[in-house]
Amino acid sequence: MHARATNHNWNATATINYYLGTTHLFTLNNVLTDFRRCNASLLTSEVLTDAIDKRTRKNITGLQYRLTPTDKWNFSVFGKYYNLYVAGPVATTEAQDEYVRTSHRMDFWGYGAAATWFIIDGLQTKLSYEKACRLPTIEEMFGDEDLETGDIGIKPERSHNGNINLSYSNRFGQHSIYLEGGLVYRDTKDYIQRNIMSMSGGKYAASYINYGNVRTKGYNFSLRYALGRWLSIGGNFTKMNVCDNMKTSMGSTAANINYKQRISNLPYIFADSDINLYWHNCAKKGNTLSLTYDNQYLHSFTYYTSNIGANKGDYVVPNQFSHNMTLTYSMMRGRYSVSMECRNFTDEKLYDNFSLQKAGRAFYGKVRVHF
């Protein structure tokens, strides 16, 4: 395949805040994104551009009211309007040699509420609920013109989300700590699932479908400690069970053998930690030398439904624990910086969600200029 895909992206954001005294705040926000992809074949001396391009436009408008009667607590309610426009080619023959342009629009409404309460100084709790909509990504709708096959008819995910968080922060001289823990609940309809399909020539590609109902229950915990301006240590741990909540099989009245089982190809336990060292005014005032070590851990998971893979090691992606190191020198208070990074410096065997091995140890360099 010798082809070229040209993507055009643009987005616009507008936010208006209106304060009514010091207690009431009204916020109106609008986010508009537009994407267009033009494909061309380079197999001949003359570039042949597809007659039908692929296009999507997303518009999300939100209105929020926030009540802040004291410094101890606040309460917010909000509503959202989602609009999605998708257009692209659809084959009209089994040989897929003739296409017509098709398009459709979808509208959804969402709403929610959130509250924050400072129980004592430094101790804060947050509660939130949202009827949400997740619009599909570019890859889920159009693929990547290679090994990802999109579906322009895929529907957005719709879910009921609940979150409870508790956090604590404090400073003791040069020492500061931050702890946070939370519980997560989601009930998702039309869950967008990534599947692997077999292609000719022994090749495989990914496709996306809407799966009826998925339920997520989980928790997360994070901890961070800092000593002055020269040391920072932190870590996160998450367990997220994303389970099949369909009692019957899709498009059938037969019992679903995967009911209450974890969705395939999704890690459900993962963690990371990092250590950062800073040398301020290194060589010159305003310059900083920093050294960062970080790691990522993924617990083993199945790339078929868990009640199948749990008893067959061949269907399990093994535990993964990778280590990275980054050295950065920033100048003129961060205006210029040069970084050198070694990812997976212990050359661990790492895999994607379908047990395909990733590249090993890698080195990167980066120069950044902040205007």
Question: Where do the model's predicted regions map?
Answer:
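Transmembrane beta-strands of outer-membrane beta-barrel pores
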Residues: 32-36, 67, 81-87, 129-135, ...
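Gram-negative outer-membrane beta-barrel transporters
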Residues: 179, 184-187, 209-304
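Extracellular loop and loop/strand-boundary signature of outer-membrane beta-barrel proteins
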Residues: 1-3, 11, 44-52, 64, ...
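Conserved C-terminal beta-signal and adjacent last beta-strands/turns
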Residues: 61, 65-66, 113-116, 127, ...
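Surface-exposed extracellular loop regions of Gram-negative outer-membrane beta-barrel proteins
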Residues: 1, 25-42, 55-97, 106-112, ...
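Short loop/turn motifs that connect adjacent beta-strands in outer-membrane beta-barrel proteins
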Residues: 19-25, 68-73, 120-122, 171-178, ...
